[in-house]
Amino acid sequence: MEFPFAIFAENCNFVEIAFVATQFPLKFIQFHRFNPTPLNDFFMFITCCALLLSIFGEIHRLNVANAKPIEKSPTELWMEEQGLVDITTVVPGIHVSLMYARSDNFVGRVMYRDLRRAYLLPETAEALKKAQTALQKAHPELSLKVYDATRPMSVQQQMWNIVAGTSKSIYVSNPKNGGGLHNYGLAVDITLCWRNDLRTAQGKLLHAAGDTTGLSMGTPIDYLGKMAHVRDETAHFQRGWLSKAHLERRKWLRNAMEAAGFKVLPTEWWHFNFKTRAQAKAHYKIVR
């Protein structure tokens, strides 16, 4: 008897599929047994297990094939209406983990309620693509990882309201003064991570498929202190506060970004601007 399992799998939920899958071998397969011995029982068990694995593999394949892309949020759709682009559609293999979509950032709050994609102006995204190419030409095992990109001025105002009057205020551009280059789509907060698509000659992944952890750079992104200052790196190394690996990785990041036209912010090793503030005010619009 032929059972149209693929059609069934597309129209049932997982619980229903699992139930039928467990019944499938016994209801639709007849095993020829020469003798009712423990050995034959063992082979029957192995055959059933193999069939179950095959069935669930087909279910997974169908789920992947029929999976719908995650719908874009209102903020993300609005970003695109402003002419901004999702950087993952421009920069091959780049990784994104927006730190203000979580609470583990220097303000300690979730600032991006429905923003998970990183957006930039098209020319900034194209420059980031060049930076990724430059990085992987020098270090094929690495990739860029973005922690923040375009930040709407409305969010900038919320951040300013949180830090105003505190020691943290020097790290947030005052909206009354025009904000910062994040508000124009002309800046990124970025680090290095391992690529998760490289394989050995034997086909083994060099790094776990889900391992896109940022490399240690001496401080976390958003660290408020002198160890994040680019100009003091050598002194921090001499004091033993930064390692040789930290200095090398920061240099690799700067080399790649500067090759594409970005400039590092001297007090934040992770922050890169694509234009000056004067250029932004003269030629670009703030993302509200």
Give residue ranges: language-model regions.
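Cysteine-centered motifs
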Residues: 12, 48-49
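Sec-dependent signal peptide recognition
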Residues: 41-48
